[in-house]
């Protein structure tokens, strides 16, 4: 990628970040939580979406899709690579909250995949990651178990943390653990809540 294009993409990202809304979400009114994760093999993406009840986390739906990848891997621009597979996996589903395996506001420019998906769909999203990016601003995340939690869109950090704590099993939110297994090639989820990640 040329430096000129890199700078333009950074500027687009910063402008999109200004459109992110952080506000409290009434967690007691949440009925469904979705989760999405994407894995790669060669130049194909395998995206998994699961829908669970909240707060008891009963698996309601699962969907796995495989698509060609049209954008290269570029650190901090993951949203350009993963948005299409994620949206195809979601289809018409619109959970009350969506957990995204990727960053939200916990991003050097305050706009990761979770923020982009939330902005595109107009639904509350939470970014979940196992590690932080270099240059991530302090105060943009909270660690819950093994997960770095950040605002995606239409939720604030305390509400996001409450949702993730409710779903936390063995250090990571159960819906994302299920989506992770499906995206990596498992045909279905047969584990209980204590199944290892």
Swiss-Prot record:
Cofactor needs: Mg(2+)
Entry keyword annotation includes Zinc: no
InterPro entries recorded: Endonuclease-V (IPR007581)
Residue numbers marked as site, Interaction with target DNA: 73
Keyword list, A-Z: Cytoplasm, DNA damage, DNA repair, Endonuclease, Hydrolase, Magnesium, Metal-binding, Nuclease
Entries under HAMAP family matching the protein: Endonuclease_5
UniProt GO BP: DNA repair
Species assigned in the record: Thermococcus kodakarensis (strain ATCC BAA-918 / JCM 12380 / KOD1)
Residues annotated as binding Mg(2+): 37, 101
Job of this protein: DNA repair enzyme involved in the repair of deaminated bases. Selectively cleaves double-stranded DNA at the second phosphodiester bond 3' to a deoxyinosine leaving behind the intact lesion on the nicked DNA.
Domain of life of the native organism: Archaea
Compartment list: Cytoplasm
An MF annotation (GO) of this entry: deoxyribonuclease V activity
Predominant location category: cytoplasm
Name assigned to this protein: Endonuclease V
EC number: 3.1.21.7
Family in the record: Belongs to the endonuclease V family.
Reaction(s) catalysed (UniProt annotation): Endonucleolytic cleavage at apurinic or apyrimidinic sites to products with a 5'-phosphate
Keyword Nuclease part of the UniProt annotation: yes
Cellular component per GO, a single term: cytoplasm
PANTHER family: ENDONUCLEASE V (PTHR28511:SF1)
């Amino acid at each position: 990628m040329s430096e000129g294009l890199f700078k333009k993409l950074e500027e687009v990202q910063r402008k999109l970040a200004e459109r992110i809304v952080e506000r409290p979400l009434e967690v007691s009114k949440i009925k469904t939580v979705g989760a999405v994760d994407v894995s790669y093999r060669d130049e194909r993406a395998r995206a998994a979406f699961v829908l669970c009840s909240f707060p008891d986390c009963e698996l309601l739906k699962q969907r796995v899709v495989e698509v060609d990848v049209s954008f290269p891997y570029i650190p901090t621009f993951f949203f350009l690579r993963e948005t299409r597979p994620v949206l195809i996996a979601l289809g018409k589903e619109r959970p009350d909250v969506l957990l995204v395996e990727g960053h939200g506001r916990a991003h050097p420019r305050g706009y990761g995949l979770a923020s982009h998906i939330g902005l595109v769909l107009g639904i509350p999203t939470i970014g979940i990651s196992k590690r932080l990016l270099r240059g991530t601003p302090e105060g943009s995340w909270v660690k819950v178990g093994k997960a770095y939690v950040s605002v995606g869109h239409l939720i604030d950090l305390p509400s996001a943390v409450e949702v993730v704590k409710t779903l936390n099993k063995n250090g990571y939110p159960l819906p994302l653990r299920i989506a992770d297994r499906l995206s990596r090639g498992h045909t279905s989820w047969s584990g209980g809540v204590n199944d290892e990640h």
